[in-house]
Amino acid sequence: MISYLASIFLLATVSAVPSGRVEVVFPSVETSRSGVKTVKFTALDQDVELKLRSAGEILGKRFAIQDVDVESLRRKIYRDSVNGAALLIDEDGPLTIEGIVNSKLRIQPFESGRITKDGIIAHQIVEVIDDKKSYDRVAVIPENVKRNAENVSRMARDDDCIVVEYYIVTDSAFTKRFKSNSALTNYVTVMFTGVQNLMDTLELGIGVRLLGVTTFTEKTEPSFIKDNLIPGPPAAFDPDVLISAMSKYYCNHQTGLAKDTDLIFLITARGMGDPREDGTVDINTAGIANSAGVCKPCFKSGIATDDSDYNERVDTLAHESVHLLGSPHDGEGPNLVSLEGSPGAANCPAKAGYIMGNRNDKNKYKFSPCTKKCVEYLLSKPTASCIFQQCTDF
């Protein structure tokens, strides 16, 4: 049986609760000859102008999910990495826009859908605020696994591209929030388009790809979910137990997308935290992942909670992804990285406020120089070979 050392860190996270500030707008969209879309509107004291480029590559070439028109979805994905925008723009009928405008604003078609101005339907802008803190955890892989992980198939070539492929599974609580697979896939696509924006701040040329999504229901949830749910109330998980069980499950079920992918993420709408003696759970954990687990069949798992409608956990998914890519929290040394020789992040204090630290307004949507060095170190090792692909392959 594999045992883990869990590193726990206080992580400021956005809880996507409306601040009370909501405004109806009629956004304009212009498309240049190069395909760049300019979206403009004024809302909540902000003049917003986004320069959006197609981001259809977020969906892998063979991405598929039941009842979803993948090629149609691919054409609708746009992002502005400078402003952190991740949007689905549908111009097949009346213009609709949904997704992340920036760190504080979200956009979606107005509920009635009947209000129009100059042929443009009304959209709702919602402001989200940071209203709580929660813990993040990282499971440190034992020493014997660290040493054995270097035995992989091939080294990267100089002309390869760095592409991190994700397989997403959702628990029944997350799945039933959505009316259809299409609505869930739209949400997850926006989420990982936002993750790509944050990965860009590493300036390492890392691409994000979704290979597929499996939406579990109460009837189809695998044992690692069912057997480890604490009834509560509310029903919740012990994150350390769940990540261990998930890792073991996929270690023993290396087939299909679970075998092909670089990372497997569970998205749950249930909470995670520390069990109390009375059978309830202190909900305090946003996410957990295995340290430097990328490309390791038995350790490439991560978990993120998401219990709202406004895609507030993009930062959590990026944070957990970077744990899997070899970075500890800012302020932590190499002893908390499951990769021999890692530089660690002790030279970057948590109070500097980056994504892997305690996050302040200046730096909370960027990674620290130490995080970049840790990820660069992992990329230099043969253990990371699975995320290097020939640039013509995607």
UniProtKB/Swiss-Prot annotation:
GO terms for molecular function: metal ion binding; metalloendopeptidase activity; toxin activity. The keyword Transcription regulation does not apply. Zn(2+) binds at residues 319, 323, 329. Its cofactor is Zn(2+). This is Venom metalloproteinase antarease TserMP_A. Residues 162-391 form the Peptidase M12B domain. Acts as a metalloprotease. Penetrates intact tissue and specifically cleaves the vesicle-associated membrane protein 2 (VAMP2) (part of the SNARE complex) involved in pancreatic secretion, thus disrupting the normal vesicular traffic. Expressed by the venom gland. Its EC number is 3.4.24.-. It comes from Tityus serrulatus (Brazilian scorpion). Pfam families: Reprolysin_5. It is an enzyme of class 3 (hydrolase).
